[in-house]
């Protein structure tokens, strides 16, 4: 158990509440290791998720800075200031590798809560990897609402596990901005 959550069960997140804090720190001096802006580490994260939490449906959620064809993210936890975003085609390569390894066809959704990720280059890179891709082609001036909006989206998904992809997409569009 971590912070009162039995993480050995595939549905451990459903036992969480808004007050649950799950925190794991990287070792000091881990610069250049365990970086979520490293495509191979992202691939290892997918392996970890698929092997430890088998499911009938999968979604992938990204929250960070987007840069269209230049990439997404940039790990800032180690003082490198997020200077190495993952390119769209690098995502595709690692996702396809993991899908082949775990015999998964595609994600139900991929959600980029980030600027500029609705470009044709990103859409092309994620083509066929998901049923629904959420991505904004413009700047998102929602920085102070990121966590609130994401908590609502995840809460809605947890409260409606059988929701179809189009209904979930409609919910996301209707609740993008705070009311």
Q: What are the functions of these language-model segments?
A:
Residues 1-61, 66, 70-95, 99:
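Divalent cation-coordinating acidic motifs and surrounding scaffolds
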Residues 73-179:
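Terminal, contiguous helix-loop blocks that mediate binding/assembly
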């Amino acid at each position: 158990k971590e912070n009162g959550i039995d993480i050995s069960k595939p549905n451990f997140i459903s036992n969480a509440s808004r007050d649950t804090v799950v925190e794991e720190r990287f070792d000091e001096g881990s610069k250049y290791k365990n970086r979520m802006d490293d495509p191979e580490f992202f691939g290892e994260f997918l392996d970890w998720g698929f092997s430890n939490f088998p499911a009938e449906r999968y979604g992938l959620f990204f929250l960070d800075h987007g840069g269209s064809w230049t990439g997404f993210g940039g790990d800032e936890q180690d003082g490198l200031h997020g200077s190495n975003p993952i390119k769209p085609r690098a995502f595709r390569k690692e996702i396809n590798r993991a899908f082949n390894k775990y015999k998964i066809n595609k994600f139900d959704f991929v959600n980029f809560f980030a600027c500029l990720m609705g470009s044709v280059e990103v859409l092309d890179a994620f083509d066929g990897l998901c049923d629904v891709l959420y991505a904004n082609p413009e700047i998102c001036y929602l920085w102070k609402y990121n966590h609130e909006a994401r908590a609502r989206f995840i809460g809605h998904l947890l409260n409606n596990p059988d929701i179809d992809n189009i209904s979930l997409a409609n919910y996301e569009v209707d609740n993008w901005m705070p009311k």
